[in-house]
Swiss-Prot record:
This is Adenylate kinase. One of its GO terms (cellular component) is cytoplasm. The gene is adk. Coiled coil: none annotated. GO terms for biological process: AMP salvage. It is an enzyme of class 2 (transferase). Residues 34-63 are annotated as: NMP. AMP binds at residues 35, 40, 61-63, 88-91, 95, 133, 145. It comes from Helicobacter pylori (strain Shi470). The keyword Kinase applies.
């Protein structure tokens, strides 16, 4: 049975980098997928689905639910690793419910934890506007992305707290400290 860890956090919280480093440090047993990377890869293919994804992401809006869930489940199932880290998911209550429904209907993957990398809005803004990764990283789009992240956050936190799988990690520290704490936590579940 594959162990799934969802890593959430504001834009600029470092969730993708944290997950990448943990997967790299434990490459024999941990695979990492960034929802953003999966969607960007699909978008770059310029397929019908890719163009649809691009239309939403270029405006900082959420990609339609069925496209995101399909993309994520396909990544989990195709992996040969026992521990899967996915960052940037869920971003909405609907995404959370859709994944929960899919996970409940099968017995190949079990959700072990949802880890939130917590940072202040100021820290997130400094990091995002300072890195200019792509066309979406300007101030107006940042505020839109922040709103999209914050609006459903309380409900997402409560849902996973009630399932006893929620964990918050302080993202205002050095990357080494954050990665160390998160990696120890993930590995504490064993195989």
């Amino acid at each position: 049975m594959k162990q799934l860890f969802l890593i959430i956090g504001a834009p600029g919280s470092g969730k993708t980098t944290d997950a990448e480093l943990i997967a790299k440090n434990n490459s024999e047993k941990i695979a990492h997928f960034s929802t953003g990377d999966l969607l960007r890869a699909e978008s770059a293919k310029k397929t019908e689905r890719g163009l649809l994804i691009e239309k939403f992401t270029s405006q900082g809006e959420l990609v339609p639910l069925e496209i995101v869930v399909e993309t994520i489940l396909s990544a989990i199932k195709s992996s040969d690793k026992g521990i899967i880290l996915i960052d940037g998911y869920p971003r909405s209550v609907e995404q959370m419910q859709a994944l929960d429904k899919e996970l409940s209907a099968q017995n190949e993957v079990v959700l072990k934890s949802v880890i939130e990398v917590e940072v202040s809005e100021n820290t997130a803004k400094e990091r995002v506007l300072g890195r200019s990764r792509g066309a979406d990283d300007n101030e107006m789009v940042f505020h839109n992305r922040m709103r999209v992240f914050l609006d459903p956050l309380g409900e997402i936190q409560n849902f996973y707290k009630n399932k006893k799988v929620y964990k918050a990690i302080n993202g205002e520290r050095s990357i080494e400290e954050i990665v160390h704490e998160m990696q120890e936590y993930i590995l504490s579940f064993g195989n």
